[in-house]
Regions:
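Proline-centered helix-kink/hinge sites
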Residues: 81-83, 115, 129, 145, ...
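Conserved AMP-binding/adenylation subdomain of ANL enzymes
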Residues: 92-109, 119-159, 168
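Conserved adenylate-forming
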Residues: 1-43, 140-172
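Conserved structural elements of the adenylate-forming
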Residues: 51-53, 65, 70, 84-105, ...
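Conserved pre-ATP/AMP-binding loop-to-beta segment of ANL
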Residues: 20-24, 29, 35, 39-73, ...
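Conserved phosphate-binding and hydrolysis motifs of nucleotide-dependent enzymes
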Residues: 75-83, 88, 163
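Conserved S/T- and glycine-rich ATP-binding loop of Class I adenylate-forming
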Residues: 68, 74-77, 110, 116, ...
Length: 172
């Protein structure tokens, strides 16, 4: 983040060049406060044309809440690899119900150090935040106990996801 912060302050509206994220060219902000050097996400929003509306309606007419959206690979309780097929309804309800069980609101911040390629990070992390309007905080590229705890403190996170081995590492 310091590298991004430095470039944002010194780069008026042109592509960024970051050593750790060479493919990242633009950073967009969400919210009411403009940030110099960054583009507002609202600038990407367009009024849909009739052609786009028709295209969306065609896709919607062929979708069902019970259609498969994702195959989550797992070893489950047996230890044998398999694909668990999830539907739109599975994933959205899971995110919504867990956000309600956690009593998360737009005032909360959830630290998500778990991998996004797993249901824990993607559904119980991202979708919980989307369903509740809370803020998703990603402490780093991969799990590091010290970085995670520092991020929780600095960002004033009100929730922290993890598995037992992660919490043990944080306690050590």
């Amino acid at each position: 983040a310091p590298e991004i912060d430095s470039q944002v302050k010194n780069t008026p509206r042109r592509p960024l060049t970051l050593s750790k994220l060479p493919s990242l060219k633009y950073v967009y902000t969400i919210g009411d406060k403009p940030v110099e050097g960054l583009q507002a996400f609202s600038a990407l929003q367009i009024e849909p044309t009739e052609a786009l509306k028709s295209q969306l309606e065609a896709v919607e007419s062929n979708l069902s809440a019970d259609d498969n959206i994702n195959i989550q690979f797992t070893s489950g309780t047996t230890g044998n690899p398999k694909g668990a097929t999830l539907t739109h309804r599975n994933i959205l309800n899971n995110g919504l119900l867990v956000s309600q069980a956690m009593r998360f609101t737009h005032k909360d911040k959830l630290c998500i150090p778990v991998p996004l390629y797993h249901c824990f990070g993607m559904v119980l992390g991202n979708l919980v935040c989307l369903a509740s309007g809370s803020c998703a905080v990603f402490p780093g590229e991969s799990f590091d106990p010290e970085t995670t705890l520092r991020t929780v403190e600095e960002e004033k996170c009100t929730g922290l996801h993890g598995v037992p081995t992660m919490f043990i590492a944080e306690l050590e």
